[in-house]
């Protein structure tokens, strides 16, 4: 992240100390290109204009990033540097991560080869999947540890996505296309039944929901924003990304959580 962004955030808080200072880090649900449609954070920034200051660690390259990357190696060191800076104080830390840990090429190793008579549940390599969930959980606890060490009063806001429908539609930008991220990998394993594919992804996302509930219960000042069962089938633009209306609905859930936690934010 450019140092200029940190300096601008610092100067803004010096000029307007009543603003609610917020730090964000995340995948495409926070970093989807603004020129195509406003993502969750874009929407929140607009809704809270004049009431919150934002330091955004995510950028265009964050699309496709998994939470294990965000909280390890260079990602961990960047988060540590920001949170430990005595000149920076945050009321909230918003994080979107975990989805890319279980879809795309990351999904392939979590599936078993299809065999005759196999149920959709048999298609999941549960040992590997539970190990992956543990890695996701560990990453979030690393974040909470950093928060406790350096920004003890800050709240962490998380979510667990929504239930996608595996399909053939990629994300297109001009002549470039990216994805799909689920169906091709399931097809490669011989899991070709549409209902089985959807059941597998629903199961995995429900387990992620359980993980986030547990994280919220185990750590202080964690707000788990319940986003599952929010989007209709028509509010998905592709396998992974909501439409503009979908992003707006998800942002409304975050806005409500922010207002409950920080009453000084307006009711708009």
Name each region found by the language model.
Residues 167-223:
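Substrate-gating cap/lid alpha-helix
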């Amino acid at each position: 992240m450019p140092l200029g962004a940190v300096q601008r955030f610092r100067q803004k808080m010096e000029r307007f100390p009543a603003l609610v200072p917020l730090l964000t880090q995340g995948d495409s649900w926070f970093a989807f290109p603004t020129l195509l449609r406003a993502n969750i954070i874009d929407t929140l920034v607009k809704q809270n204009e004049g009431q919150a200051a934002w330091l955004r660690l995510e950028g265009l390259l964050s699309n496709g990033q998994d939470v294990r990357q965000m909280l390890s190696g260079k990602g961990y060191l960047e988060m540590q540097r920001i949170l430990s800076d005595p000149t920076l104080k945050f009321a909230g830390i918003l994080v979107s991560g975990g989805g890319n840990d279980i879809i795309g090429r990351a999904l392939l190793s979590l599936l078993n080869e299809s065999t005759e008579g196999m149920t959709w549940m048999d298609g999941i390599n549960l040992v590997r999947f539970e190990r992956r969930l543990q890695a996701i959980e560990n990453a979030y606890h690393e974040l909470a540890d950093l928060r406790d060490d350096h920004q003890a009063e800050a709240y962490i806001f998380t979510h667990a996505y929504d239930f996608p429908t595996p399909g053939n539609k990629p994300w297109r930008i001009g002549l470039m296309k990216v994805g799909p991220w689920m169906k091709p990998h399931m097809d490669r394993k011989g899991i070709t039944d549409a209902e089985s594919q959807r059941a597998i992804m629903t199961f995995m996302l429900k387990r992620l929901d359980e993980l986030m509930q547990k994280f919220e219960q185990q750590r202080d000042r964690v707000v788990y924003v319940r986003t599952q069962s929010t989007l209709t089938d028509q509010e998905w633009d592709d396998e992974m990304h909501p439409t503009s209306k979908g992003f707006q609905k998800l942002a409304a859930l975050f806005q409500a959580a922010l207002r409950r936690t920080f009453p000084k934010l307006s009711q708009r």
